[in-house]
Amino acid sequence: MKLNNTLIAGSVISLCCLSIPNAEATITATYTTPKAVYTTNDSPGFSFMDETGKYFYHDTNSNYTKYSPNNAEHAWRFFSAKNYQGVNNKVKNASDEYAEFKKIYDKATVQNTVPLCVNTPLMKKIKPKGVGSMDYINYCGLMDVWVDPDTGDWYGLLHDEIFGLDPRYDAIERVKSSDKGVHWEVVDVIQTSQYGMKDKRDEALGQTYNYGGGDPRLFVDYASGYFYMFYTSRVQNLSGWSGFSAYMQEHVMRAPIAGKMSPDSWRKYHNGKWEKYNTQDYSLGNAGPASNIVSVDVSPKGYFTPEYNPDTMSGTASELVAQGKLINSSLRVINVAWNSYLKKYVATPEPSSGPTNDGLAPMEFYVSESLTNPKWEKLFTLKDYVTRSWYRFMMDPQALTLSNFIVGKSFRTFCYNQCQKYDGGEYIDITLKNSNESKTKSAIKLTQFKNKLGDILTADKKFNLTVTHGKTENKMSWGLLDRQDGYYHIVVYPKGKANKIKYLGVTEADSANDFRKWGAEVGLTAEPCKNDPASNICLSSQWVKVSTVKSKHDGTEIKDGSYRLVNRLSGLTLSFDSTQRLDQQVTLSPFRSWDCTETTCLDGSKAYSQILQ
């Protein structure tokens, strides 16, 4: 595709925001002209894979209308194909007649979400009275799915829009399916309004109120072993119009992945620390406070003070802004991924909300070195790419299998609704370049691959992989070959014979799913990318080095030099274990920071087998 713009650090990029080894380095960003997509809905698009390597795309809609079986206005749509592009093609070529269109749905699709929405644990607890102008007390959407490596169960985040109260509120609950989406259950509440969910028909409210936390965006962080959930709240005037998106706050909470999103595992980021909060009384709003996170150009601390409180602050929303007590966060509705080229987290916010609601606005990118103590700095602004979309997500443009996970030097960012060239939906590909990037062929950094238990990855003279424990006479040279695009090849060759190099990846696979399934056997092959750099065998031979971070609740973190190697194609980790049977000693496994102790574990790998040192 033809590149239509270039941004250079020092003009539209501040050098302070870049991951650079010296002050002379610059980051440039080129991006393509927008290309249309057809999967658009009233949410971002979410992508994940199950234990068989099957790819799923899902999105959601919950219109303020009565349910009809003849449309998808109250549906969680699921599709399956080789990857996102396959789903996009299915939708593009499908019939406009809904009875025919439904035939391309995956069985996980929920056609009528109303019974789920109006009978959640939160609805049963707070018992909304209902509002005459609305058909239902709650409109809800499924936002992201994570697959439990112990059971294969699906867990997801539910965005609630509660119209049964006056005024309305947002909230977040947890959903679960134990049969790949055939049946869903809303199991418990994660987040409401920290100031309570008061109905003005029952008790007096102040001049403004907190709308509650919703619109969750999930990031699964393999570095720290935490789920990070970014979510948005609003400050609204109780009387009169304050602008639906005029006074938005951004927050983040986190929970250990091992806790499987259970309510009592979450902590909110507040004043630079991760604090526990009350998860018992939903009507009290899960009372823990959460800071409004902002970029460092607004506050060097990374969050705004003073903290909004409707019980102690007087004035309308605009008056509170004028008093310096409220700010519309520039990070509202952010999507987050790890950029392995920059070695930083990258975020894309919704661009145009604010007190003036001016419509289309340039797209901005922010980066932070840490999520433990986030300091989001603006990396650059695409001044000629203007949209107003809330619904964004990022993907690796080669794999196209996981949303908002790991991206590299080139990545794809999607826009749904109110986009630049194709109003309904589009994407652009962005390519970054660091001026300090080597212009010569990368050298191999020799290393030994040893896991936390002391197992060492080796190979015999016929390039058959073996795993030994303790000292070994390894006659092979092992190393990491930096592709300089955010990805590595794991390579091996007989000592002194680099011309006989082999590459580590999935070699025995008949289909795309086989390359991506849990337990896929890993082997060595010659020149996997020679024929087709976009092929599964090439992508499965590429790895991301993710350093392990011990993240503390006080906002500090420690790196001990250990790391995981994450497969580019599948998002699974390299796992090797000398205690396993021979054909399962070197495999791909889902992320683990804990061991499954049941006899029915779907994935039986151990956490130590994927932590390298």
What are these regions (language model features)?
Residues S43-F46, Y139-W146, G214-R217, R332-N335, ...:
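Beta-propeller and closely related beta-sheet repeat lectin domains
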Residues M1-A9:
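Bacterial N-terminal signal peptides that target proteins for export
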Residues A25-N138, V147-W154, L158-E203, Y222-G225, ...:
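Beta-rich carbohydrate-recognition and catalytic domains
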Residues R201-L218, S389-F411, G561:
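Short aromatic loop motif centered on NTY/YTY
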Residues A9-L18:
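Bacterial N-terminal signal peptides
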Residues L116-V118, R168, F414-Q420, P528-D532, ...:
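Sequence contexts marking disulfide-bonded cysteines in secreted/extracellular proteins
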Residues E51-T52, D59-K66, E161-F163, Y222, ...:
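Short, flexible beta-strand-to-coil junctions
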Residues S438-F463, N474-K517, P533-R581, T600-Q613:
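Extracellular glycan-recognition/adhesion modules and their associated mucin-like linkers
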